[in-house]
C-alpha cells in the first residue's frame, strides 16, 4: 500500500511538473518562441507540413500547419518572412496555441504579423476564452505583403490560452495565412481627468510595437469585441487604423499617434459623457508620419452634431498643425469621431496605404463666451 502511495505521489509530481512546463509566465514582449525560429525536428515534418502537434517548441498546433522558411516558393510566388528566417502557415481550420500565466482581470493586447498567400477573402479568428474576434486580412496595407495586427482581451483566470485559428475553407487546403512575430503586452486603460474628458487622448496606451518594426500596428474594426487594443477608442469603420510610434514615424505629441490609412473607411471614435446645453472644445493635432505620404489631406472631426474639416498639405517628411471645434452638447453622451476624407498611397512605393496622423486629442468643458 505504501508503494502504491509513493508511485501515486511520483505520478502526481510528474503531471504537475509537465503542466507547469507547458504554461509560461508572461512578460511584455515576444511570446516564448513567438518568432518561430525554434522549429520542428526533421522527423516531425513531411515536406513543410508539421506532423507532431507539439513539434514547435512552446506551441501546440492543430490541423494542417506548415513550417515555412523565408524564400520558400508557392508556385510562382516567393514567400518572404518579415523577421528572422521562419514563420508558420495555417491551412483550413488549422490553429496554433500557447498557454501563458497572466493576471486575472488584467487587460492584454496581442500583436502579430500576418500575410495572406492566396487571393481568397482570408481572415483569422483570435481567441482567449471567453473573448474572441475575427480579423480580416484581405486588405494588404503595406508593400511587403506583411502587416502587424493587434487584438485585446481581459484575462478571466490566471492562465490564458492564446489561439490563432484560420476558419477558412479554401479549395487548396494549404492555402492560408502566414503568421509570425507573436507578442503581447499588458494594458492599463487610462481614465478621464480634469484636463481631458477623453480617455487616452494622446494614444500613449496601446498595443506593443515590435522593436525593429517599421510598418506600425493595425488596429482592425472591433465592432463586436468587448475590448480594444487602443483603450478608450473604438474603430468604427470597414478598415483598420494604424498605431504608429516615435521610434519609426513622426509623431506630433508624446510617443504614439494614430494614422488614418483608408480614407472614410478608416475611423476611430469615443463616446463621452456630456451635460446637455454645456459648451465643449475639442482640440487635436493633424500631421503626417514622415513616411512619404504626400499630398492634400483632409481630416474630418465630429463632435456631437458638429463637424470640422481640417485640410493639411503633406510633404511626407513630418509636421503637423493644430485645430479645434467648439460645440454645445445636445445629449448626455456625445460621440467624438475622426476619419480621413481621401485615400492616399506612399510616394516611395505607390502600394502602401497611408494617410494623415491625429494626436493629442483633448476635450474640455468651457464657459460660454
Swiss-Prot record:
<dbReference type="GO" id="GO:0010015">
    <property type="term" value="P:root morphogenesis"/>
</dbReference>
<dbReference type="InterPro" id="IPR008979">
    <property type="entry name" value="Galactose-bd-like_sf"/>
</dbReference>
<keyword id="KW-0134">Cell wall</keyword>
<dbReference type="Pfam" id="PF04862">
    <property type="entry name" value="DUF642"/>
</dbReference>
<dbReference type="InterPro" id="IPR052437">
    <property type="entry name" value="Pectin_Meth_Modulator"/>
</dbReference>
<dbReference type="GO" id="GO:0009505">
    <property type="term" value="C:plant-type cell wall"/>
</dbReference>
<keyword id="KW-0964">Secreted</keyword>
<protein>
    <recommendedName>
        <fullName>Protein DUF642 L-GALACTONO-1,4-LACTONE-RESPONSIVE GENE 2</fullName>
    </recommendedName>
</protein>
<dbReference type="GO" id="GO:0009506">
    <property type="term" value="C:plasmodesma"/>
</dbReference>
<feature type="signal peptide">
    <location>
        <begin position="1"/>
        <end position="19"/>
    </location>
</feature>
<dbReference type="GO" id="GO:0009536">
    <property type="term" value="C:plastid"/>
</dbReference>
<dbReference type="InterPro" id="IPR006946">
    <property type="entry name" value="DGR2-like_dom"/>
</dbReference>
<keyword id="KW-0325">Glycoprotein</keyword>
<keyword id="KW-0732">Signal</keyword>
<dbReference type="GO" id="GO:0005576">
    <property type="term" value="C:extracellular region"/>
</dbReference>
<feature type="glycosylation site" description="N-linked (GlcNAc...) asparagine">
    <location>
        <position position="125"/>
    </location>
</feature>
<comment type="function">
    <text>Involved in the regulation of testa rupture during seed germination. Required during roots and rosettes development.</text>
</comment>
Amino acid at each position: 500500500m505504501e508503494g502504491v502511495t509513493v508511485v501515486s505521489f511520483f505520478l502526481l509530481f510528474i503531471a504537475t511538473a509537465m503542466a507547469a512546463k507547458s504554461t509560461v509566465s508572461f512578460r511584455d514582449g515576444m511570446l516564448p518562441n513567438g518568432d518561430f525560429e525554434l522549429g520542428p525536428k526533421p522527423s516531425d515534418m513531411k515536406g513543410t507540413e508539421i506532423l507532431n502537434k507539439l513539434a514547435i517548441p512552446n506551441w501546440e498546433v492543430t490541423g494542417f500547419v506548415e513550417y515555412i522558411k523565408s524564400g520558400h516558393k508557392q508556385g510562382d510566388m516567393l514567400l518572404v518572412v518579415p523577421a528572422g528566417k521562419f514563420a508558420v502557415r495555417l491551412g483550413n481550420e488549422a490553429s496554433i496555441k500557447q498557454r501563458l500565466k497572466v493576471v486575472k482581470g488584467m487587460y492584454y493586447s496581442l500583436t502579430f504579423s500576418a500575410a495572406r498567400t492566396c487571393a481568397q477573402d482570408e481572415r483569422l479568428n483570435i481567441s482567449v476564452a471567453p473573448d474572441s474576434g475575427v480579423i480580416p486580412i484581405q486588405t494588404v496595407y503595406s508593400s511587403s505583403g506583411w502587416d502587424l495586427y493587434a487584438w485585446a482581451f481581459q484575462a478571466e483566470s490566471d492562465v490564458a490560452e492564446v489561439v490563432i485559428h484560420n476558419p477558412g475553407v479554401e479549395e487548396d487546403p494549404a492555402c492560408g495565412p502566414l503568421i509570425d512575430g507573436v507578442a503581447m503586452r499588458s494594458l492599463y486603460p487610462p481614465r478621464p481627468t480634469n484636463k481631458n474628458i477623453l480617455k487616452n487622448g494622446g494614444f500613449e496606451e496601446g498595443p506593443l510595437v515590435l522593436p525593429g518594426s517599421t510598418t506600425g500596428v493595425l488596429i482592425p474594426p472591433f465592432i463586436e469585441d468587448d475590448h480594444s487594443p487602443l483603450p478608450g477608442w473604438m474603430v468604427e469603420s470597414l478598415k483598420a487604423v494604424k498605431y504608429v510610434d516615435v521610434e519609426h514615424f513622426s509623431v506630433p505629441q508624446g510617443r504614439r499617434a494614430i494614422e488614418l490609412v483608408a480614407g472614410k473607411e478608416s475611423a476611430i471614435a469615443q463616446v463621452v459623457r456630456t451635460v446637455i446645453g454645456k459648451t465643449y472644445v475639442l482640440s487635436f493635432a493633424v500631421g503626417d508620419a514622415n513616411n512619404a505620404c504626400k499630398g492634400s489631406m483632409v481630416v474630418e472631426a465630429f463632435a456631437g452634431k458638429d463637424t470640422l474639416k481640417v485640410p493639411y498639405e503633406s510633404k511626407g517628411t513630418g509636421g503637423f498643425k493644430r485645430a479645434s471645434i467648439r460645440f454645445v452638447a445636445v445629449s448626455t453622451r456625445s460621440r467624438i469621431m475622426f476619419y480621413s476624407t481621401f485615400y492616399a498611397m506612399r510616394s516611395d512605393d505607390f502600394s502602401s496605404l497611408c494617410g494623415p496622423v491625429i494626436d493629442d486629442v483633448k476635450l474640455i468643458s468651457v464657459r460660454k463666451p
